[in-house]
Amino acid sequence: MRPSSPSGGRSSRTRVVALLACLAMLTACGQATQTALTGTPSATESAVTPGPDAPTSTSEVDVEREGMEPAVVTAVRYAAHQTYDRLVIDLEGDIPGYNVKWVDEFLQDGSGKPIDVRGGAYLQLTLFPAHAHDEDGRPTWKGGPIYPADLGNLTEVVRTGDFEGRVGIGVVLARQAAFQLREQEEPTQLILDVAH
């Protein structure tokens, strides 16, 4: 039989484990959640944790993924932060392949017709395989196709298409700036930060 401790039989190790469990619970309760209308700027900080580094690249990004079911775009949200603007693409399913590059103008997928928006720079994101509609053809990313943003650098978001397993998202900026992309799971999101 063990001798009893002054704390009513609990060992120091048990107290430490209990303290760590309480801290974990408090941390989980303290995380912010955000709900925003689809395609609208968010008044609060994103629930996505901030990136470890400021955006530093202006180079094209191309990530290919094959043999997967198409992801479904459920929302695109955006918010201004102190030194950058953040665009969050909410997805159902796994993160699809994607391409991000600077373009001279946005074109409608399928028709190739120019989309009339004005800005200083245009960043085109294309997700594949992906859809922005359900099995019955109803949009899952509602509104648009042009969503005003008026943030530090990001001025508009454009749905350039949802065609043949590809979803196009145009980011209209006041000026070309460094950007970074991050993938997040649980919830599944592709996150684009663009410097001011």
Predicted region positions:
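Signal-peptide-cleaved, periplasmic/extracellular N-terminal interaction regions immediately downstream
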Residues: 30-196
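Bacterial N-terminal signal peptides that target proteins for export
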Residues: 2-18
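C-terminal motif of bacterial Sec signal peptides marking the signal peptidase cleavage site
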Residues: 25-28
